UniProtKB/Swiss-Prot annotation:
Lineage: Archaea, Nitrososphaerota, Candidatus Cenarchaeales, Candidatus Cenarchaeaceae, Candidatus Cenarchaeum
One BP term from GO: lysyl-tRNA aminoacylation
Motif ('KMSKS' region): 294-298
EC number: 6.1.1.6
Originating gene: lysS
Protein name: Lysine--tRNA ligase
Residue interval(s) of motif 'HIGH' region: 39-47
Organism: Cenarchaeum symbiosum
GO CC annotations, alphabetized: cytoplasm
Coiled coil: none
Domain of life: Archaea
Location(s) in or outside the cell: Cytoplasm
Alphabetical keyword list: Aminoacyl-tRNA synthetase, ATP-binding, Cytoplasm, Ligase, Nucleotide-binding, Protein biosynthesis
Keyword Nucleotide-binding: yes
Annotated family: Belongs to the class-I aminoacyl-tRNA synthetase family.
Amino acid sequence: METIGRGTWIDKLAHELVEREEALGRDTEMINVESGLGASGIPHMGSLGDAVRAYGVGLAVGDMGHSFRLIAYFDDLDGLRKVPEGMPSSLEEHIARPVSAIPDPYGCHDSYGMHMSGLLLEGLDALGIEYDFRRARDTYRDGLLAEQIHRILSNSSVIGEKIAEMVGQEKFRSSLPYFAVCEQCGKMYTAESVEYLADSRKVRYRCGDAEVGGRKIAGCGHEGEADTGGAGGKLAWKVEFAARWQAFDVRFEAYGKDIMDSVRINDWVSDEILSSPHPHHTRYEMFLDKGGKKISKSSGNVVTPQKWLRYGTPQSILLLMYKRITGARELGLEDVPSLMDEYGDLQREYFAGGGRGGKAREAKNRGLFEYTNLLEAQEGPRPHAGYRLLVELSRLFRENRTERVTKKLVEYGVIDGPSPGIERLIALAGNYADDMYSAERTEVELDGATRGALSELAEMLGSAPEGGLQDVIYGVAKSHGVPPRDFFKALYRIILDASSGPRIGPFIEDIGREKVAGMIRGRL
């Protein structure tokens, strides 16, 4: 089978995108990819992933010889439906108001919406993602969607019927797919848009009670007109994507399964109402918390880029996003160690050559490593040490941690000497050891012989001679008929939750014999 591009799903999508654009007869010199991002709640890894994956497809398009641009569009005209957990209760008075019109409770941005947007932009910057930042407030205020809004609202009756037909939503049969902002009370979801005045391009609305975020919000009773050429309101999501796609010449946008119906309708609006071919898409599954629930911007189960980057490198996040796009995945900060070590394995395989799984697998892993480094050429491997080993050593050495952990890594033969890269890894693993360490480990499968050997070793750890522990461990394994390699692997799994590590005898001495004996007994 022929390898497409660098052998990843990213390359496959990019090739499909370019082939489609060429078949449509559109100019492919510059290809815009878009990520539509919410600004009403705390941005999480799922929000980040939408933009990171779109950027990856853009990189692959660039790899094919085209120019690309990632448009990061933040919907800060969206209304606040509920106050996210952990945010000030003073935000309650702003429910149903556009997040761009709500003061930043922390006073560091021009609005609540920009505060939330800023957190996500901070994450993108940390990863090295380049983007063209656009705000809904400015987009509407500057009239960039004015023509699209006019055509959509002029065809609101047929659109309302189509929405009802496609997804069974009756709402837009009786009201326009446009949320006006009441000029009297400043709320938007309470202001029902009832008529489009095409000649003046204004929307008539009346502000009444509405259900917002699962509760009733009172309207003020005002009736007025909103100018669709400014920021006096916004299109509903059921039609807004299509307006953006045409106005910004968007050729690719991925989407989560939670907005699948909105994308289907927008595709139809784009094709049939705006006479503009909709972008190429791919659907991704959502990140779930460890309880299997969807990660939500308004709930407390949010893994943010900032939290992750306290413990892991940017490459660990990029690996998470680029290794695959299909299938729902449970995600928590406890996944940082495995992704850090997986990146180390990818790097080692990339520079050493070879690898398991045949040529196609090797090509895919090489491509994955390259995308994880944003296609920036790597002259050689970055300094690396097993993350779980670093965490264990960091738990042992809290005073003068960097110096003492580095010394042990040199003694174990893991590194040749100190370096800024290793110091950074020690700092990250130290944060994890201080904040996150849990005695909970993955299940270790042990056969009867290995259990017997481990039980004997736990008893002997207190009496084995100084400096002779490596030979004692080897002898115990042999006496129980357990291959030493397998016995060492079981010990690494118990101590490090990994399949390999430094020379086991000196490592146990460093951790403490009594402590390791307790760890072994806890698994028997």
